[in-house]
Amino acid sequence: MKYQFKTGIDSKEYDKFVRNFPSTSFMQTPAWSLVKTAWDNDYVGLYSDKKLVCGAMILKRNLFLGKKLFYIPRGFVTSYDNDEALKIFVKELKKYAKKNGAIDIKIDPFICFSEDNIQNIKKNKGIEVRKTFTLDTDKIVKKLENLGFVHGGFKKEVNAYIQPRYTMAISLRDKDGNFYEKEELRRTFPKNTRNYIGKYHEDRGVYFSYSTNKEDVKDLISVLNCTEERQHIALRSEKYFKKLMDAFPDNAVLFFARVDIDKYI
């Protein structure tokens, strides 16, 4: 099969490719480059019969003496089951990196090493978990290692990696793959979590709301400032969150919980 590697792919074409791909991350969309403005970027891909089959949004950072770092957040965007295409894509990517003075290509692919229920981790509940994302993980990691990538290991420190190792998600399907009804989904939550849903806390003065207005970022920042002072840490700025709201106008949502102190007490 004949393949063609291209750089400088039109952002609209690449965005369509990413959005139509079965499993990928928002960090591979062109919108993410609007947030990471301190980095240069490019969209590259491998075509088969004029169809894009492998792709990557590359973030480029200038280092010393004209050298660069290539970082592909939550990429590549590919199914990993076409060994020939993956091999050619990586080979051409390395050539492109070398030509542009990159001394390292860092990737953190959107693949999952393991899946479990938080109740199993906390209390060893023995809850059966439907495996969705970990079916071929070992094979994919081995393929990438064979192509020259070095696995970063499994460190537990929060700042050990560019992106967090752990992702919390609520499964909307049962172990057989069927979507939960609303009340069924609610029953999957721990009891103390269920208490926060519905009238139980509303009657006690706790109210939940959401907003897509970036002017409300100031309310988020006021809470983050309290967290920074309490934990002695530094979190993201108001400017950063407003960038997110601008870059993802149809997807970025702010969620708030507010307490009526007089009623709650």
Residue ranges of predicted features:
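Acyl-donor binding region in acyl/amide transferases
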Residues: 66-160
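A conserved beta-strand-loop-helix scaffold within acyl/acetyltransferase catalytic domains
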Residues: 3-49, 53-66, 111-114, 132-137, ...
